[in-house]
Amino acid sequence: MNYLADTIAAIATAPGRGGVGVIRLSGRNLLPLAGQLSGGRQPRPRHALYTDFVASDGQAIDSGLLLYFPAPHSFTGEDVLELQGHGGPVILRMLLARCLELGARLAEPGEFTKRAFLNDKMDLVEAESVADLIDAQSETAARSALKSLKGAFSAEIHRLVDTLIDLRMLTEATLDFPEEDDVEWLEKADALGRLAAVRRQLATVLATARQGAILREGMHVVLVGQPNVGKSSLMNALAGDEIAIVTDIAGTTRDTVREQIVLDGVPLHIIDTAGLRETTDTVERIGIERTWQAVERADVVLLLVDGRDGVTAADAAILARLPERLPRVFVHNKIDLTGETAGVSEEDGHVVVRLSARGGAGVDALRQVLLEAVGWQGESEGLFLARERHLDAIRRAEAELEAAGQAYGLAAELFAEHLRQAQACLSEITGEFSADDLLGVIFSRFCIGK
């Protein structure tokens, strides 16, 4: 049995109550099914038909709009039906059950978009952008996801692939004429110059993709320090709300407290943690263990110190335990008590921000430091969202092109092979060269109905 030949159905609107709910179906030859749903009425392509949706006994389940999009001019490339009824969960479940009764099966997560991909209605980057647009955590991320959905990222990759194909054709032509000297032929065609040009182009795309990945993923910022240095106050200041409990009692925060904010379109996942100290309190010790677990998953660590005490031996011990790979920022808090001036400086190779978490002085400067620490350049125009798998594929293509440069002059066969591998890496991004298990992972993360 051809699994993709099944008619699939799902509720396409978000769970809960609403004014309108949508059931989506996709498959082959859906007009007979549409007639059974509507009591014998036949919808015209791309025209809304107001009708009752009827059960097997002819009783109305609901009334609403029936829309029919015949293949191949539909979202999935197959016949598509949309039932727009009232948005109550019970009604929608009854309508979905009726569709399943008529021979459809329940769609898997992302199966509508997967069929669109398999039917060449969109490439893999555009398909992923559907999920990214739904999951966007800021306006900037949503706009960038829409650019990817409209093909901006794919166009960049296709330009790179086309350039590599031209260079491969040139190189492989030398292999077809063994009487010609390989190196001399490639020098005449400026193959090395063309390789340098495509490497520059790839570096530009990688830089843009990194920015897009920051927009999509955001970053995890963990606040660490001794008890009562102002971690919870700083979290509240960054969030602009009273998220964490603040008292003068050391050890008030005993577990991780999480909050998400958006800075310049970038989602920041801020994690306040238990104060780090030696303790016999069982609950507090569990909180301290969770602090170190959060640090391991962080993108940036803020090490808070009490500005009145400066960096103590206990602070130095915390610093020594932080993973080397992690960007860290020293935050000297409580300048309202020390009389210091708010601002950013570099001391002993560390970025230091002096601020008052309670008064707010210097907090804006810290926000800018956080964006710089994660590599955000603040320019969202022209950005497209990217995923870690995209960055990995581009980096591997970059390595293959570097190897091609090293192979130049040694053997045209080796030079051509590295170009081919680079092209294959880039083609993974758009799905022109992808393993079935990769496709399964990607589409399984979509919501039902997409």
Swiss-Prot record:
Family annotation (SUPFAM superfamilies): P-loop containing nucleoside triphosphate hydrolases (SSF52540)
Subcellular location: Cytoplasm
Entry binding sites for GTP: 228-233, 247-253, 272-275, 356-358
EC number in record: 3.6.-.-
Example of a GO cellular component annotation carried by this entry: cytosol
InterPro entries associated with the record: G_TrmE, GTP-bd, GTP-bd_TrmE_N, GTPase_MnmE, MnmE_dom2, MnmE_helical, P-loop_NTPase, Small_GTP-bd
Keywords, in A-Z order: Cytoplasm, GTP-binding, Hydrolase, Magnesium, Metal-binding, Nucleotide-binding, Potassium, tRNA processing
A GO molecular-function descriptor: GTP binding
Self-association state and partner proteins as the record states: Homodimer. Heterotetramer of two MnmE and two MnmG subunits.
Protein name per UniProt: tRNA modification GTPase MnmE
Organism encoding this protein: Laribacter hongkongensis (strain HLHK9)
